[in-house]
């Protein structure tokens, strides 16, 4: 039997008992100790991205580094490669002009390495040998301060995203800078994915609230979406993946949902992740507890990280900021199980920002608050 939070509360059940009685199983996992071997002079920061190529090599995009990034903090982007046994191989793109504030790394079917840098508004493709050959977007020529037209509405929007209900006048636009939809240009992009024809899809992102598309030659084709909560609208599209049937899945974090589109941007369906929070298990490592939150990026189930397993029968792995769990989800939106709980120990999570899933039995997780990458070994398939 399935319980909604509201129904359970009306029945006088505690949050703990809701978790115990709802139908989503808690799935077993093993977190492998020290999966990556770092040189003595390299240190991880916030882990914005993690990816695995066809040879089992692991790529980590960390908010740390040896170069001087121009935005947000002194060193805010470093791309590292490890072999299948976790041995350090190299740093890619050292002192690269685009490095500013790491957000995502992905590997395409040809083993090219794609990085999304939120701070420089750039998405780059590296060849497997480690040199850039495609560049999307352009970094600004100088740092400057943008003064929002209405500071009160900016703060109201931030509070809304944290789950605090605020009254914002309809005529005021609390998004700043104002979204500008230009070809080959981004404003705080977040992720990238590809379809079976080699087209690229970009989630763009914190400001522009849209999805961009380029063809197999790297030529800009189109974009869709705008700021809002209706079908085909977004509030911080934070992750993106494409199924074998070429359906585009977008993690619409601020609206706490995953939307699905065809490759022309036509809306197909959407679904939400509704798994009650057991507040007695694990202490959150960021923000504040809001187990009954239904809106905003910090609400339970708001998709922060998104990964689709390869092969003909894929599943989704979705991570949230609060309470920091991983959900195993069918492509139709059924939650098949949940992994982990908030915390700092192995098998616990603090702000899941990146997931790589070379199979259902092997999951790599990048965390912002805990400054680490975990390798999770699981058992079972979507049919179990």
What does each model-found stretch correspond to?
Residues 21-384:
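Eukaryotic scaffold repeat domains enriched in small/polar residues
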């Amino acid at each position: 039997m399935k319980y909604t939070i509201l129904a359970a509360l009306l029945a006088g059940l505690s949050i703990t008992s809701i978790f115990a009685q709802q139908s989503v199983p808690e799935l077993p996992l093993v977190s492998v100790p020290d999966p990556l071997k770092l040189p003595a002079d390299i240190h991880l920061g916030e882990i914005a991205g993690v990816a695995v190529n066809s040879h089992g090599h692991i790529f980590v995009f960390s908010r740390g580094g040896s170069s001087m990034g121009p935005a947000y903090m002194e060193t805010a982007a470093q791309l590292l490669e490890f072999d299948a046994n976790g041995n350090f191989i190299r740093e890619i793109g050292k002192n690269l002009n685009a490095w500013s504030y790491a957000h995502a790394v992905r590997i395409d079917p040809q083993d090219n390495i794609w990085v999304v840098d939120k701070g420089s508004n750039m998405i780059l493709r590296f060849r497997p040998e480690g040199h850039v050959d495609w560049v999307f977007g352009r970094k600004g020529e100088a740092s400057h301060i943008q003064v929002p037209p209405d500071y009160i509405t900016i703060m109201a929007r931030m509070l809304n995203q944290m789950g605090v209900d605020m009254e914002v006048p309809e005529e005021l636009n609390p998004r700043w800078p104002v979204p500008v939809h230009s070809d080959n240009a981004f404003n705080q992009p977040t992720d990238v994915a590809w379809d079976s024809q080699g087209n690229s899809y970009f989630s763009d992102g914190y400001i522009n609230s849209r999805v961009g598309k380029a063809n197999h030659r790297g030529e800009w084709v189109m974009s869709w979406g705008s700021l809002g909560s209706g079908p085909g609208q977004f509030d911080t599209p934070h992750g993106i993946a494409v199924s074998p049937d070429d359906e585009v899945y977008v993690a619409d974090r601020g609206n706490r949902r995953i939307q699905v589109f065809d490759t022309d941007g036509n809306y197909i369906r959407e679904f939400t992740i509704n798994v009650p929070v057991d507040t007695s298990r694990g202490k959150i490592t960021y923000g504040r507890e809001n187990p009954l939150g239904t809106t905003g990026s910090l609400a339970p189930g708001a998709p922060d990280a998104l990964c689709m397993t390869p092969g003909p029968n894929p599943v989704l792995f979705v991570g949230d900021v609060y309470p920091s769990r991983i959900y195993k989800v069918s492509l139709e939106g059924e939650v098949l199980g949940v992994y982990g709980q908030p915390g700092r120990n192995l098998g616990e999570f603090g702000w899941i920002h990146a997931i790589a899933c070379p199979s259902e039995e092997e999951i790599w997780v990048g965390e912002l608050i805990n400054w680490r990458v975990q390798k999770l070994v699981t058992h079972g398939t979507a049919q179990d």
